[in-house]
Amino acid sequence: MYAFHPDSGELLWKFDCNPKNAVYKLGGRGTANDFVATPVIYDDKLYISVGQDPEHDTGVGHLYCIDITKQATREDKDVSPTLVVATEPELKEEPNPDSALIWHYGGPATADNPSPTQETYYFGRSMSTCAIQDDILYVAELGGHVHCLDAQTGDLYWTENMFSNTWSSPYLVDNKVFIGNDDGILYVFEHSKELNILGEIYHDDGTKIRATPVAANGRLYYLTESPTKLWVIEDGAQAAADGN
């Protein structure tokens, strides 16, 4: 992740969102990830999840909270959590005194740090852009788990398994969180530190919801795939006779 001065283009800082021992391998077999999601700025902090091509399937992912006000003192402007100081005979890293990391969520699960989703990793590869309001953050991983965290500390409030992959991002509006999945189900959660599923909207034609919903003028809009349709939901409205 790079931050530049908007007027001069000067590099302000850079932050490595992969562990130093992560490696790229074809077909998703590696541990290094890419950016598929969009960074979100909230309260002078940057939030970003990492993942891979969804065709690479699930795997270890990470979610970072970065201090965007950090003043980098190093010549290379590196504000990553650690710095590599040797590669031979083995990789050696040390804490970076310039680190802009506020908190990190993810990585492999361990006995001391068991996964809240019962997976072998704490947070999976993600294509999801975070949604944040009232210091409450929502993010999803490719494998279909929705996570709700404290945006300031990274502490977990709750998770929910949608039992289907999701390419979608949570959309927060009117104190509700909307997100779709590959089973064609649009989930509606209450914006809350407590898990409360307000509803599930089903499509029984084998379609997928991969785009992120959007709301305007009291209506919710979202796309489905295979077949491609645009759906519009309005409070109190009745579905058309043909379902379109």
PLM region descriptions:
Residues 1-244:
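Noncatalytic, solvent-exposed loop/strand surfaces
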